[in-house]
Amino acid sequence: MQGFFWKTWLVVALCGTSSSLAHRPLSYGEALELALSIYNSKAGEESLFRLLEAVPQPEWDPLSEGSQQLNFTIKETVCQVEEERPLEECGFQEDGVVLECTGYYFFGETPPVVVLTCVPVGGVEEEEEDEEEQKAEVEKDEEKEDEEKDRPKRVKRFKKFFKKLKNSVKKRVKKFFRKPRVIGVTFPF
């Protein structure tokens, strides 16, 4: 009976040790491919995204047991997710969404963990355009108000209130959809 206990204990110890052994080396190119594959499968987008640009990481260590960071830019393609076509066959959309992504690989975890954060490019320019549109809209509204001087003050106040409410809702909706997407997954080696 004691022999059986020790044999079982030895098998359990070996299994536990083998899972904590070093991970398979992951080159920078493989890490980019894996990150892109994870984004396309987990982000919930309708279109596939393809690598537009990768920032070289000279300090990338494929044998590292710590964390590794990579930065890259992806762009929306004409291919849909459900088509399951190779990315090389998918051209970029003319006005496709461009995302700047940062990926963190945590190799010290068992199993290793990847966390991706992607944010749309051009957020500042879009905000400036939105402000210009709002200013133009306010000017038009002021012109209309001058024409509508015969209306009661109550109607004017309600109109002004609902205009502010509309602009506020528009702004919040745009902000909501600009939030970065964060994806975290574990992957086996």
From Swiss-Prot:
SUPFAM superfamilies: Cystatin/monellin. Residues 23-155 form a propeptide. Keywords: Antibiotic, Antimicrobial, Cleavage on pair of basic residues, Disulfide bond, Membrane, Pharmaceutical, Secreted, Signal, Target cell membrane, Target membrane. Residues 1-22 form the signal peptide. The putative mature sequence has been predicted by AMPA, a predictive algorithm for identification of peptide stretches with antimicrobial properties. Residues 125-148 have a biased composition (Acidic residues). GO terms for biological process: defense response to bacterium. InterPro entries: Cathelicidin-like, Cystatin_sf. It is found in: Secreted; Target cell membrane. Gene3D superfamilies: 3.10.450.10. Potent antimicrobial peptide against Gram-negative (MIC=0.25 ug/ml against E.coli ATCC 25922, MIC=1 ug/ml against P.aeruginosa) and Gram-positive bacteria (MIC=32 ug/ml against E.faecalis, MIC=32 ug/ml against S.aureus). Adopts an amphipathic alpha helical conformation, that may allow to partition into the target membrane. Low hemolytic activities have been observed on mammalian cells. Residues 125-152 are annotated as: Disordered. Expressed by the venom gland. Pfam families: Cathelicidins. This is Batroxicidin. Belongs to the cathelicidin family. Disulfide bonds join C79-C90, C101-C118. Its main location: secreted. GO terms for cellular component: extracellular space; membrane; other organism cell membrane.
